């Protein structure tokens, strides 16, 4: 039955990642405000007939985004953005069901023990918070300024990442062998760097969501400098101000600084793993190197080519891949 538990956790992880990626595409295509109602139960089916599509389109037209951004949009164009948002919401519902129904089964079968159930309940509560946060985010854009709050967008993403983190950590603990290393070998440094890397990846994902929410990737499309300067001229004289977090230039600059910081931390982690001279940790170091390289490359490509959807989605996906490898590393060290 432990194999079934492992398969379930893996399925949940895949579903959460799919939800994150589709959510990212929804943001990149400005589709998030196409469904102007929150119907958790009755909204599981899309419009089928011409009349129901027209009714949904009429609801959309009643909100500012249509007149301010998409005035003159055809029904076919509306269907595209509507279905993207619909698939994103449907994935959220499906992921919740795929999580809760087997959870009940595994608990009453005794596969999930009482000592472990609290952490699973926390994940369940996070799913509920995530659903509410998604609508709270959408609601922020159904106003005179038709753009969702970039802060709410970032928290919506971070909650999904926390859910993935908790599920993936359980998956790794459930299916990976422990690390057999002599007790005299000190793993304190790799452990510290792995914790620091996880924390920095969270910061970067949050900053990346702010960049997406402010369309900050569409300015200063050069690398490594911003308009010929390391620090862009717009923020040199006003660096410490909360208002900067509403400024696309500032947010992009901080996201770049985060990328440099994360690279240093992950490289330090890789070096500390290689010094242990353990085959399994060497493998982790190799995967970390590949994940970091691809993540940095997709980030630069996304910037230089004005945020193409494929590159931006790959950049988001490899942030999750990099996080996964670091969580795997942390689990191996912590449980050795």
UniProtKB/Swiss-Prot annotation:
It catalyses: Fe(II)-heme o + 2 A + H2O = Fe(II)-heme a + 2 AH2. Pathway: Porphyrin-containing compound metabolism; heme A biosynthesis; heme A from heme O: step 1/1. The keyword Transmembrane applies. Its EC number is 1.17.99.9. It is found in: Cell membrane. GO terms for cellular component: plasma membrane. Heme binds at residues 255, 315. Its cofactor is heme b. GO terms for biological process: heme A biosynthetic process. Its main location: membrane. Coiled coil: none annotated. The chain crosses the membrane at residues 5-25, 92-112, 117-137, 153-173, 191-211, 253-273, 284-304, 307-327. One of its GO terms (molecular function) is metal ion binding. Keywords: Cell membrane, Heme biosynthesis, Iron, Membrane, Metal-binding, Oxidoreductase, Transmembrane, Transmembrane helix. Interacts with CtaB. Catalyzes the conversion of heme O to heme A by two successive hydroxylations of the methyl group at C8. The first hydroxylation forms heme I, the second hydroxylation results in an unstable dihydroxymethyl group, which spontaneously dehydrates, resulting in the formyl group of heme A. Belongs to the COX15/CtaA family. Type 2 subfamily. This is Heme A synthase. It comes from Rickettsia bellii (strain RML369-C). The lineage of its organism: Bacteria, Pseudomonadati, Pseudomonadota, Alphaproteobacteria, Rickettsiales. The gene is ctaA.
